[in-house]
Amino acid sequence: MKVDQKGHTVIIRDTQGDFTSFLMKVTQQYKTFEKHNIIIDLLMHNDLSTNDIKLFMPLSKQHKKAKKSFVIVTSDFDYNAVPAKLTVVPSLLEAHDIIEMEEIERDLGF
């Protein structure tokens, strides 16, 4: 697991290739990142199912309650199959754009 920080955003990238252990590590170390916007980079995983992505739902809910953004990045995926409560995008650039827009919305009181 590799963690990069850019301003108020933390990018968490899986370096092992084992989705289950990555999810466990992110969950266990969540307190370390809870004060930042989070981008979960799953670009190295080409075989993720909708159910795999849904496993991040509890973390996403908790994070959004704290008024922070939680974005998952993965490619080759049916983005319409994911619940609206989860934010899933195809690129890191798009993830940063979403976080920027959500920050503006929070600043405006939405």
Regions found by a protein language model. Give the residues of each.
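Flexible, charged surface loops at secondary-structure boundaries
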Residues: D4-K6, K31-K35, H63-K65
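Short aromatic-glycine-(Arg/Gly/Cys) micro-motifs in beta-strand/loop hairpins
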Residues: S60-V82
